[in-house]
């Protein structure tokens, strides 16, 4: 097992958060063979230290003509009439900057032409094969099928602030670290379909996936940081044991104890 620190969002990822994450995971009884605290064969284990790997992948995708520069803002995409909301993550990209030919990088409407040697300054999107079915068998949820261009659109692989996007970074890391199984929440099913396309484009084999059911409150809402959900640290302070935290579907102890 590998512990990887996905710290590309430098505004929200601070050293004290990494230390707290490691402490909480060890308290839960989770052990790993490699990670930022113990090193290993496939380091470094912080994404902020792996830019060279991501840039090489960006160059491969650019040379193969499967990504293109995009000057659209989030507001542009959200307001586009042809961009229905996908529901779980982001609007469907309307294709405003998508070139007609795979290797044409000319921006529309006379906008600034981006450098083909430096990804910074514009977003770079992966051109999905419209109509193609992406199929995989989830180890928990069973057979899955999503259609590119319908269930998700062209997605960002490199951000305008010159930082690789999540989708590209995790694919590169999974391949470089020889990851064979990925366990994560069911809210990332569409991300898995996107990542499978990236694995194929880069010539890698995708790992197996196990998408867990989400932890929800009594009203059925997903517990998340942005909703002020309780952290493991807070549960520890409230007196929960590691067994109570780890028990799926278990009854929560009294809050005040």
Show where each model-derived region lies:
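Short, surface-exposed acidic
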Residues: 33-36, 206-209, 243-245
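N-terminal Rossmann-like or analogous alpha/beta NTP/dinucleotide-binding catalytic cores
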Residues: 1-86, 175, 186-187, 191-204
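Short coil/turn segments at secondary-structure boundaries
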Residues: 72, 92-94, 247-249
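Short alpha-helical "patches" and their helix-cap loops
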Residues: 2-9, 211-214, 257
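Residues that form generic nucleotide/phosphate-binding pockets
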Residues: 24, 57, 80, 96, ...
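Conserved catalytic-core subdomain
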Residues: 42, 218-257
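Active-site cores that bind ATP or allylic diphosphates and position pyrophosphate for catalysis
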Residues: 75-224, 231-236
